[in-house]
From Swiss-Prot:
This is LPS-assembly protein LptD. Its main location: membrane. Keywords: Cell outer membrane, Membrane, Signal. Together with LptE, is involved in the assembly of lipopolysaccharide (LPS) at the surface of the outer membrane. Component of the lipopolysaccharide transport and assembly complex. Interacts with LptE and LptA. Residues 1-21 form the signal peptide. Transmembrane segments: none annotated. GO terms for cellular component: cell outer membrane; transporter complex. It holds the Pfam family LptD. It is found in: Cell outer membrane. One of its GO terms (biological process) is Gram-negative-bacterium-type cell outer membrane assembly. It comes from Alkalilimnicola ehrlichii (strain ATCC BAA-1101 / DSM 17681 / MLHE-1).
Amino acid sequence: MRRLIPIAITGSLLWGAAVQAQGPTAAEREAYFAERQRALCGPPLVMPLDAVDTALRHRPETPATVDADAIYYDGAAGRYRFRGDVLMQRLDQRLRSEEVRYDHASGRVDLPFPFVYEEAGLALTGESGWLQLREDRGEVVAGEFMLDERNIRGRAERLELADAQRSRYEDVGYTTCRPGNEDWWLQARELELDREEGLGTARHAWFTFLNVPLFYTPWITFPIDDRRRTGLLAPGFATSDRHGTDITVPVYWNIAPNYDATLVPRWIERRGALLGGEFRYLQEAFSGELYGEYLPNDSLARDDRWLLGIDHRGRLPRGWRYDADINRASDGDYLRDFGSGLLETSSSHLQSRGRLRNRWNDWAVAAEVQHWQTLDDDLRNPYRREPRLTADYQGPFRAGQPRYRLNTEYTRFALPDTDADRPEGERMDIAPRVEWRLHRPWGYLTPAAALRHTQYRLDDPVPGADDRSPRRTVPTFSVDSGLFFDRPFDWDGRPMVQTLEPRVFYVYTPERRQDDLPVFDTSRRDFFFDGLFREDRFSGADRVGDADQVTVALTTRFVDLGGGREWLRASLGQIHYRRDRQVTLFPETDRAADRRSRSDYMAEMRSELPGGVLAQGEYRYNPYDSRSEQGAFRLGWHPRPDLLVGAGYRMRYGDEGRDVEQSDLAAVIPLGPRFSLIGRWLYSLADDNSLETVGGLEYRTCCWRVRAMGRRSFEGAGAEPDTSIMLQFEFTGLGQVDSGSTDFLQDSIYGYEGDRF
């Protein structure tokens, strides 16, 4: 189901779970889980349906061979009667019985005594019956059956084969468990299996699990393969301190190959009945999805609650493309009350945007309208863009020749009526640039020159200024250079190479007075290793930072020459300032860091080793105060699809007392072929408090599995903890009962992709 992507404009201090190594590919995952399932279930019960060309069965000339103790032939009728340990074979069809009566003209086989019949994709036993071998039809009395789809098997008082794709059963028991193990069993008065549609339909059915009858249903449909189809999806059952009992019963409607919808009725004990829905569509020229939720008269909030999302995109003639992304909520607490993850529940804004764009050769143009819904009343509203028009040119790259670039933008910035104290207006920004990249195997040199002209037309001047049409023009000059040194060596019989890559980056931007310019969409960039090589310390056009500085950095790599894998990359760098930085976001801002002659030391490393091990880190050290300012370190191990262990640590100090120091542990650990442990612990060292604790256990057999999980989370400072329990049952070939645990794990544990069952 679609998830709205809220945005925290002020910068979320929460972060994703511990990193994991790149891990197995999709093909490796598929092969691994298939092999694990074979280990649990043993060999297939029947020959796969695609093992032979079944069209040959329908040809009268396809020969049959018979081995029997006695053969009787009625020449006038063209019928055979075989008796005594009869074995009849025709292509992949194999029949055993004490007596077989065969009409050669029609291909019909009558079976008055117990028999065993096998063909690709099907195995039957019965007390009596008849089979039409050329047409894949027949009837069986008191029979047992096995199909290759998901190891389906069962027994029925009467069994009718309509053709190779459709079959009907009366007084039938159905399961996907191995013979001798009937952990779950569906007993129905009537069952229809449609292999062409991949659908099973049972009427007047009892479902029994571990010899305990659980429920009766007059009618139920279920998938017998992996295709999508209309019907009930997995009901969800959960309980939490906040909501009490929480039950969802989603219904999927496969309207057409390019349309589908999901209706999600949900009952929340302490709030009431909520109705959610999603509609997806796909056409040649456009596609998209609509999503909404509505809760009338929330019992706790005493008001109607709702959420709306529209994501639409398409193509127009002459290469034009458009998209619209609209997100709205009834109130600022909606995501906190009904969201499922830390990102959703801590988000501060919802974005709505419409855009039209095109590209011709080296030109790209776009028109955009952007609005925001602020979910936190304590935060200022972001500026709306009504509209934003851009035209950008980027010339082709040709070795040894200059490359030209031009970015132009016009934007009208507006605010809701409640923000009358902040300036509104228009901004025109023009930024031409030329650079010349000289590259050799041993190094490179890239000089560049840029100009940025920004002009405003304001409804009211910036406080403290009197100019409604301020403007600013500022040039920037930079030179980026680097050298490459390498040293081949041998490590434990493996050919390797180590590189040493010094890099020097110089940038000069003269100071221009900018206090009379508004701050519409500009902020100071986060400073990590990549920031050492930026020409501007600000994002957005409202400020261009003055600069006269040199960055010196060093990178080393260890590369496996055999497979090309980069086992280790480590970098260290620092900026040396030739003068103080004068340009700030606001005149009253005074940052001690802007008066220093050197920046913090910045370091980063990444190591990806054989066996699915990944280590990754970024670090920022303040040499003036001799302390760490910021860092993130992650260690992951993902050697196979069902094993994932990750640990992470993040810290950030010195931001007006809002220190962040968090640790994150996450793991999915198999305990043999049947059990798996699942856990995550996100802990705030700064607050000495757990932000989220998740623990669970999964048990699987050949034909069913269960996952039980508990979660305890804090969703804000001073908030009461919320405890919830999630339970998931999945029955192979029938469906699942889920509380959303799979989606939750994919959101919470980085690298968790779900389990093929």
